[in-house]
Amino acid sequence: MATKDTGGGQQKATRNTEEVEEQAQDAQASEDLKERQEKLSDDVDSVLDEIDDVLEENAEDFVRSFVQKGGE
């Protein structure tokens, strides 16, 4: 009996191509997440710097706002 070629080699090549494409998509997603994390980190640092500036200028007022007066 003669065996029939089912084209299994093509399926393997297609599977490898799909794996490479999936890895490329994962790498892109990872890079996008890294960029987003860096941006958020920069935003948080900016807000913290602004808070520090306000506290340096108005530290006494800031502390007074938290001191209870007359049993409040």
From Swiss-Prot:
Chain intervals with Gly residues compositional bias: 1-10
Coiled coil: 9-60
Biased composition (Basic and acidic residues): 31-42
Disulfide bonds: none
Segments of this protein annotated with the region Disordered: 1-45
Origin: domain of life: Bacteria
GO molecular function: proteasome binding; protein tag activity
InterPro entries reported in the protein's UniProt record: Ubiquitin-like_Pup (IPR008515)
An annotated GO BP: modification-dependent protein catabolic process
UniProt entry keywords in alphabetical sequence: Coiled coil, Isopeptide bond, Ubl conjugation pathway
Sites of the Isoglutamyl lysine isopeptide (Glu-Lys) (interchain with K-? in acceptor proteins) crosslink: 72
Pathways involved: Protein degradation; proteasomal Pup-dependent pathway
Region feature ARC ATPase binding, mapped onto this chain: 28-66
Domain notes: The N-terminal unstructured half of Pup provides a signal required to initiate unfolding and degradation by the proteasome but is not needed for pupylation, while the C-terminal helical half of Pup interacts with ARC to target proteins to the proteasome.
Family designation: Belongs to the prokaryotic ubiquitin-like protein family.
Annotated function: Protein modifier that is covalently attached to lysine residues of substrate proteins, thereby targeting them for proteasomal degradation. The tagging system is termed pupylation.
Subunit structure as annotated in this protein's UniProt entry: Strongly interacts with the proteasome-associated ATPase ARC through a hydrophobic interface; the interacting region of Pup lies in its C-terminal half. There is one Pup binding site per ARC hexamer ring.
Protein name: Prokaryotic ubiquitin-like protein Pup
The gene coding this protein: pup
